[in-house]
């Protein structure tokens, strides 16, 4: 780097002016899109100043050496980029990194041609991941960078990699394309064929995190030098799409299997021959693979590392790893694997080194699976379902080089001694989290190299003397969290090298004798046991013990000789016991001890325990019962001391050790400390925790000499005042941070001694710490009747007060005399306050029992509180000379009289409180001298009269309270002369109802309604009757003989009962109408759910729209791909299975590869109701695509009604105008509505064929989609030997029960039946016969049904050759699924309800009455080849001919006329039916018997299907 810095030369300004700035991203040509992008970019917090600005001549050219010649050449990096020398190269080559917003998007136009081609060998492009804008790479974007060797493009939302994008990059070695489209599911990443045709020298290719769904054929074939490929975190579903399948091992033409080859297989076979690459590393983890097929990686002969972890793989073919001759590391972890084929590692037996299978569902483990893998070094089988049944002497045979074996988190209950017979090189064995209850003798004897044995979290109860025989080099043994109640004294006899022993979490009551004389032991963990007593010789012979953990036991005392045999002990943990007594000198025998934990015990005193321990550095004695502490109790070398949660009232330092101690951390929180001073804290302290104590006083200079101080916690104490000297420290150097103090949570008082605290963080002298929680500090106001507390930072100078009794200013010379106005003397029984400047002087005499004005009230009083006394009158000149008085409280003092001169001299009075007294009248001159008065409170007196002009002189009056008096004729309109009045209170008086007065009063009320705060309560009195003044209809004034009269309206009193009844009826009627309107939806739901008035509320079926009746589906659901689980598992599960709706789901049933608009409209038109699940995922993904919007527009134009299901939180700002319009005009149902299902059923049409087992009719949904069967089925046909082609049924399926360890794949070759009659054609019976197959065990009833299924398949295969053209296409590896699956078998015959009898004449009689399906004739469309004795399902029985022969163990079927027909109940539903059988009485789901997943049509109108079924049953 120094070499390059020396080469940087200044550039002449003339040269600078000749070059213009070039940026990768230039301004878009359309101003409208530019403004739109600025708005979006602004939200994302991205600056566009450099990306979007036009070129400017502000570039400084960067010189670069040109090689050996030494001539510098200029390297001109674009403004969006920065460069650095490429690592690991001697030549001055450049690695360029460009940070862009997007690449060629609607916001930016990107020009990569400005990147200098010379010296640029590495280019890294990073886009802004927060911007969801689609980027684009143009053809030949990097064609000029002919020397480029590394190209990395990340976070750019690319949708396609064209075939000419990489043109010109012939020298490219390393390519990384990570769009991270996986976070934007709506955007896929597609790669065109021949996209890598130019980059033939590519060695490393990373295409991870791109949301790739599929790949072109042989896309990687041109990369002959490729050694590493990363395809992780995509959406790939078929391993064969990678193009690494070895097709040379597939069957040739002319075989029987070729006749049943599916359309997908033909397409694969017709592609070019498989290419062979020299890949050494392949990562396809985090995809959606569910099957690992045979020969899937067969062409990768040199592959060493294969990672297929974190997929959904549930089945692995026998030859899945065929061709991988050099495979060393295989990672199949975090899948759904249940079993593994026996021959999985057949070709890698001599090369495989590491196998990772953890976090699967493996419950079956073939004993031959791992045998003789003599190069295997690591095997991880943890987190599976393996039981001891599958671990025997053959499981690990031949693993002579195995070093690591992980069997943790399984269900092992026992270990046989022969299991580990060949594992003599094993070093680490993990058996944690199993169910082992005992260990047999010599179980681990063969593993003489084992150094780590983990047996924790099992159910071991006792450790036998011979359980650990042979473990001579064992160094770590974990037996924690078992149920051990004892250990044999000789249990560790052969583990002489043991260094770390974990016995915690057991039920031991004493220290095991087996520990004695274990001279190599370094650590012993006996915590969380039940040990109550430790003998003096408990640790005899443990001379090298380093750490001892005894936490969480029941120890009560420690004797002097307990640890005498542990001279090298350094860490001792005795926490959480019941220790109350520790003998002095108990720890002195262990002179090297450095850390001791005694917290959580019952110690009262530690005097003499630790003072003579010079090596002690760390001591925790918290949560005990200590009442006293002195620094002399601990050694001076101690660095960390924890005393929190004790009962300490002080920190004593009798010997003055504050300068000698080396203590750095001290925790004394949660104690009872009341005072701290300089000697309470050592000078070496760095971290001090004093919070949650009772500290009231912090002495000055407490922290003065604590030069290493970094943090002090004083919060949650009882500090009320704090002197500035209490926090003073020595000056801190500029390069060091000031100490941090936390003092919040204290009951500070806003006195005059604490005002400095408000500004302490702004002091620049660096002699005071920083208060980190200053904003949280509140202080209590000493005298404030409006609020008790105030935030310290909001307090004003007038809030910081101090009390005084007497004070004499320096300029006052009469203080020695009695009559001295400049002397401040607080009256008796009063409290006086002042601020720092004495501008605020408060005299508080409230409730002092004065009967007359207190004498000697200070002349400079600014606020006087004399309320709550017993004055009869306020005499004249009572406040004479108090020229500074601004606030006067004389309320609630029984004042009856005030005089004209009472308030003389109070020119500065602002607030006067005289409420709650006994004042009778105001004569007019009482307030004339109060020209600056702002607020006057006279409420709750007995004022009956107020003279005119009483308030005339109060020009600045703003608040006047007169409510609660006895006023009758006061001319309130005179208050208009007070221009600043904003608040008047007049209620609760006895205002006159005389008409003349009342008119003027009302007029004033109308004009001053905003000022009079209680105008609604103002009323007048007439003949002891009260009336609100604003009431106009209740009274009326008339003039008769010049006298105003008040008349009640008695005319209507006789009509009151009638009016009351009419009013109630009116209110009830409109209440009923309003209730029906408000709850109309609930009433509709109730009527629908109870079928109440259904014939009246809804149209009769004969009035239903004929077009809707012809639609095959009840509803079509559109939703986001991210909400697929919610729709499939919750909505569809309930609507289809519980209610019987026929649904079409977008991502399940619609061909999403077709044009979205047409597919969506076609699917919606095939259903009676269109339902859209609106969520945040839909708004951000699908709705952002034009196709969805146009489809929804078209549906609305066709008057297609839309029902919205609102799922999750919907951000309002992200809902555009179109969606808002649809939401306003459509039915919306919220998922979290408690009546969601009722409302949804009300919004949907009645299901077709209600009451039947309705199949989902997807003819309208699947238009243009190729039907296929279950590609993930588990059966023999999915093997390399068959090439993915389903063979015809043969007799070899009948017997496979003899092979006890056969998988489904091996059933075909197995021989010897196990309780089955030879059924020549039943592959399903073969599957059921396998004892240890990968599928669930079948019941007898299921075996019987499967046998019947085999016969049906036989007849279907006979019809196969005649009607090959009518067969539906099938996936390349698809096989029939004969076992229970998630797909229901509709219209199944319930044989559990039939009465089946064995008959000597082979007559299958009295089968019972079958149920009719959908109310149609079940016999319609039946094949004519049935026996003439056949009775339709509506009849009473099936009678076979005398010549019939029985088929099956329980005579379920009859073969009549030499096999000419089979009696099977064939039910019909709609236009399609499945030949199925059920074994449960409640129509539970059972496998279909058809060879394919297609259904047999029984409609007479379909001639082709009718012919097919006749031939099928011929």
Curated annotation (Swiss-Prot):
LRR repeat residue numbers: 145-168, 170-191, 199-222, 224-246, 276-299, 300-323, 324-347, 349-372, 374-398, 399-422, 424-446, 448-470, 471-494, 495-518, 519-541, 543-565, 566-589, 591-612, 614-635, 636-658, 660-682, 683-705, 707-729, 858-881, 883-905, 906-929, 930-953, 955-977
InterPro entries attached to this UniProt entry: Leu-rich_rpt, Leu-rich_rpt_typical-subtyp, LRR_dom_sf, TIR_dom, Toll_tir_struct_dom_sf
Chain ranges on the Extracellular side, renumbered to this chain: 15-1057
GO CC annotation: plasma membrane
Cytoplasmic topological domain: 1079-1514
Gene disruption phenotype: Viable. Dorsomedial or dorsolateral mistargeting of VA1d ORN axons. No effect on the immune response to septic injury using a mixture of Gram-positive and Gram-negative bacteria; adult flies are able induce expression of antibacterial peptide genes (Drs, AttA, DptA and Mtk) and mount a proper innate immune response.
Biased composition (Low complexity): 255-273, 1473-1484
Positions of region (Disordered): 242-273, 1473-1514
Signal peptide: 1-14
Membrane-related topology note: Single-pass type I membrane protein
Membrane-spanning residues: 1058-1078
GO-annotated biological processes: axis elongation; convergent extension; dendrite guidance; regulation of synaptic plasticity; signal transduction
Domain TIR: start-end pairs: 1111-1244
PANTHER family: IG(IMMUNOGLOBULIN) AND LRR(LEUCINE RICH REPEAT) DOMAINS, LEUCINE RICH REPEAT CONTAINING 53
Family from the record: Belongs to the Toll-like receptor family.
Protein name from the UniProt record: Toll-like receptor 6
Source organism of this protein record: Drosophila melanogaster (Fruit fly)
């Amino acid at each position: 780097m120094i070499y390059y810095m020396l080469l940087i030369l200044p550039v002449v300004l003339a040269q600078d002016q000749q070059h213009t700035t070039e940026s990768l991203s230039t301004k878009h040509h359309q101003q409208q899109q530019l403004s739109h992008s600025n708005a979006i970019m602004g939200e994302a917090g991205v600056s566009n100043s450099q990306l979007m600005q036009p070129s400017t001549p502000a570039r400084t050219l960067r010189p670069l050496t040109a090689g050996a010649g030494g001539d510098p050449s200029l390297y001109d990096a674009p403004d969006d980029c920065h460069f650095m020398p490429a690592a690991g190269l001697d030549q001055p080559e450049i690695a360029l990194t460009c940070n862009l917003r997007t690449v060629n998007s609607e916001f930016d136009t990107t020009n990569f041609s400005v990147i200098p081609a010379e010296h640029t060998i590495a280019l890294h492009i990073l886009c802004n991941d927060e911007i969801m804008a689609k980027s684009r790479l143009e053809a030949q974007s990097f064609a000029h960078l002919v020397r480029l060797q590394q190209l990395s493009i990340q976070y750019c939302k690319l949708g396609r990699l064209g075939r000419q994008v990489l043109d010109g990059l012939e020298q490219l070695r390393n390519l990384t394309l990570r769009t991270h489209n996986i976070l934007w599911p709506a955007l896929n990443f597609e790669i065109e064929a021949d996209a890598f045709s130019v980059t033939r020298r590519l060695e490393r290719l990373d295409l991870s995190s791109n949301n790739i769904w599929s790949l072109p054929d042989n896309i990687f074939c041109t990369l002959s030098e490729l050694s590493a490929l990363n395809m992780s975190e995509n959406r790939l579903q078929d391993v064969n799409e990678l193009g690494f399948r070895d097709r040379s091992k597939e069957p040739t033409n002319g075989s029987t299997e070729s006749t049943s080859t599916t359309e997908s297989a033909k397409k694969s076979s017709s592609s070019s021959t498989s290419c062979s690459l020299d890949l050494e590393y392949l990562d396809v983890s985090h995809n959606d693979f569910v099957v690992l097929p045979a020969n899937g990686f067969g062409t990768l002969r040199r592959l060493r590392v294969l990672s297929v972890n974190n997929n959904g793989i549930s089945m692995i073919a026998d030859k899945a790893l065929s061709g991988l001759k050099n495979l060393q590391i295989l990672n199949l972890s975090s899948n759904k694997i249940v079993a593994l084929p026996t021959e999985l590692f057949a070709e890698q037996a001599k090369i495989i080194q590491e196998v990772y299978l953890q976090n699967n569902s493996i419950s079956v483990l073939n004993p031959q699976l791992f045998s003789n893998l003599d190069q295997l070094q690591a095997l991880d089988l943890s987190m599976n379902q393996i039981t001891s049944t599958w671990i025997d002497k053959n499981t690990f045979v031949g693993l002579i080089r195995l070093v690591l074996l992980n069997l943790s988190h399984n269900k092992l209950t026992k270990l046989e001694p022969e299991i580990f017979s060949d594992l003599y090189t094993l070093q680490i064995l993990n058996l944690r989290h199993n169910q082992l209850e005992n260990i047999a003798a010599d179980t681990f004897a063969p593993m003489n190299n084992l150094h780590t044995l983990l047996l924790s979290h099992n159910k071991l109860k006792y450790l036998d003397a011979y359980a650990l025989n042979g473990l001579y080099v064992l160094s770590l043994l974990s037996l924690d969290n078992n149920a051990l109640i004892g250990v044999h004294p000789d249990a560790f006899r052969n583990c002489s090298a043991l260094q770390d022993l974990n016995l915690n979490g057991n039920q031991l009551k004493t220290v095991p004798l087996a520990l004695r004389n274990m001279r190599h032991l370094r650590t012993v963990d006996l915590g969380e046991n039940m040990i109550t007593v430790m003998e003096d010789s408990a640790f005899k012979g443990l001379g090298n013990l380093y750490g001892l953990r005894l936490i969480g036991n029941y120890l009560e005392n420690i004797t002097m000789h307990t640890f005498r045999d542990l001279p090298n002990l350094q860490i001792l943990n005795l926490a959480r016991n019941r220790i109350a007594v520790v003998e002095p000198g108990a720890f002195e025998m262990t002179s090297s001890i450095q850390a001791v934990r005694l917290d959580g015990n019952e110690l009262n005193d530690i005097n003499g325990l630790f003072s003579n321990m010079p090596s002690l550095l760390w001591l925790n004695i918290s949560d005990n019962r200590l009442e006293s502490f002195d620094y002399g109790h601990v050694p001076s070398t101690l660095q960390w001391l924890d005393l929190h949660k004790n009962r300490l009232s002080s920190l004593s330092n009798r010997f003055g050790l504050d300068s000698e101690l080396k203590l750095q951390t001290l925790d004394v929180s949660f104690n009872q400390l009341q005072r701290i001073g300089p000697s309470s804290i050592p000078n070496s302290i760095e971290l001090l925790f004093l919070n949650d104590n009772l500290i009231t006083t912090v002495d000055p200079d407490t922290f003065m000499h604590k030069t290493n101080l970094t943090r002090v916690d004083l919060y949650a104490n009882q500090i009320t005042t704090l002197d500035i000297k209490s926090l003073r420290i020595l000056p801190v150097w500029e390069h060091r941070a000031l100490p941090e103090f936390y003092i919040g949570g204290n009951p500070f008082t806003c006195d005059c001694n604490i005002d400095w605290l408000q500004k302490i963080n702004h002091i620049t002298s660096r002699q005071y710490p920083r208060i980190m929680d200053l904003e949280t500090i509140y202080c209590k106001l000493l005298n404030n009747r409006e609020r008790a507390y105030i935030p310290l930072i909001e307090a004003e100078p007038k809030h910081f007060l101090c009390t005084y009794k007497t004070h004499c200013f320096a300029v006052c010379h009469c203080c020695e005399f009695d009559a001295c106005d400049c002397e401040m003397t607080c009256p008796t029984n009063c409290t006086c306050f002042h601020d720092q400047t004495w501008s605020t002087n408060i005299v508080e005499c409230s409730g002092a029992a004065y009967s007359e004005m207190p004498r000697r009230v200070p002349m400079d009083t600014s606020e006087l509180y004399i309320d709550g006394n017993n004055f009869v009158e306020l005499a004249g000149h009572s406040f004479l000379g108090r020229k500074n008085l601004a606030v006067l409280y004389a309320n609630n003092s029984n004042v009856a009289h005030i005089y004209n001169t009472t308030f003389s001299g109070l020119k500065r009075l602002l607030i006067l409180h005289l409420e709650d007294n006994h004042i009778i009248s105001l004569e007019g001159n009482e307030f004339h001298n109060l020209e600056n008065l702002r607020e006057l409170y006279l409420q709750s007196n007995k004022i009956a009269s107020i003279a005119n002009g009483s308030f005339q002189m109060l020009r600045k009056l703003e608040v006047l309270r007169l409510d609660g008096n006895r006023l009758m004729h006061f001319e309130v309109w005179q208050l208009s002369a007070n221009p600043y009045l904003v608040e008047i209170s007049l209620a609760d008086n006895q205002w006159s109802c005389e008409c003349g007065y009342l008119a003027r009063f009302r007029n004033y009320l109308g004009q001053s309604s905003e000022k009079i705060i209680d105008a609604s309560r103002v009323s007048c009195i007439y003949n002891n009757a009260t009336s609100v003044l604003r009431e106009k209809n209740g009274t009326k004034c008339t003039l008769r003989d010049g006298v105003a009269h008040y008349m009640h309206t008695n005319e209507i009193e006789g009509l009151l009962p009638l009016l009351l009844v009419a009013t109630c009826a009116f209110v009830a009627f409109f209440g009923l109408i309003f209730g029906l309107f408000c709850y109309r939806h609930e009433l509709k739901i109730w009527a629908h759910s109870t079928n109440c008035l259904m014939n009246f509320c809804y149209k009769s079926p004969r009035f239903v729209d004929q077009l809707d009746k012809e639609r095959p589906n009840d509803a079509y659901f559109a939703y986001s791909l991210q909400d697929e689980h919610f729709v499939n598992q919750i909505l569809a599960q309930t609507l289809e299975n519980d209610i019987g709706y026929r649904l079409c789901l977008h991502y399940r049933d619609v061909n999403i590869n077709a044009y979205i608009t047409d597919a969506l409209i076609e699917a919606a038109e095939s259903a009676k109701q269109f339902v859209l699940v609106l969520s945040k995922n839909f708004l951000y993904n699908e709705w952002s695509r034009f196709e969805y919007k146009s489809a929804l527009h078209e549906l609305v134009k066709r008057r297609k009604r839309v029902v919205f299901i609102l799922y999750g939180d919907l951000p309002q700002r992200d809902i555009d105008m179109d969606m808002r319009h649809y939401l306003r005009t459509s039915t919306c149902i919220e998922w979290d509505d408690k009546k969601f299902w009722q409302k949804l059923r009300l919004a949907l049409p009645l299901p077709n064929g209600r009451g039947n087992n309705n199949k989902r009719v997807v003819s309208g949904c699947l238009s243009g989609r190729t039907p296929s069967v279950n590609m993930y089925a588990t059966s023999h046909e999915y093997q390399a030997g068959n090439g993915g082609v389903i063979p015809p049924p043969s007799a070899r399926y009948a017997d496979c029960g003899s092979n006890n360890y056969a998988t489904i794949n091996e059933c075909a070759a197995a021989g010897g039946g196990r309780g089955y009659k030879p059924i020549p054609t039943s592959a399903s019976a073969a599957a059921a016969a396998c004892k240890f197959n990968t599928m669930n065990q079948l019941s007898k009833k299921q075996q019987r049904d499967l046998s019947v299924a085999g016969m049906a398949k036989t007849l279907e295969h006979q019809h196969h050759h005649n009607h090959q053209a009518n067969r539906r296409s099938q996936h390349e590896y698809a096989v029939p699924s004969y076992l229970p699956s998630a797909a229901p078998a509709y219209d199944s015959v319930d044989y559990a309800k039939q009465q089946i009898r064995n008959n000597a004449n082979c007559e299958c009689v009295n089968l019972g009455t079958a149920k009719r399906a959908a109310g149609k004739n079940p016999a319609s469309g039946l094949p004519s080849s049935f026996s003439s004795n056949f009775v339709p399902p509506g009849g009473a029985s099936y009678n076979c001919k005398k010549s019939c022969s029985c088929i099956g163990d329980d005579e379920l079927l009859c073969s009549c006329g030499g096999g000419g027909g089979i009696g099977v109940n064939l039910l019909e539903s709609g236009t399609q039916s499945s030949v199925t059988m059920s074994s449960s009485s409640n129509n539970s789901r059972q496998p279909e018997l058809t060879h394919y997943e297609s259904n047999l049509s029984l409609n007479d109108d379909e001639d082709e299907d009718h012919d097919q079924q006749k031939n099928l049953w011929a």
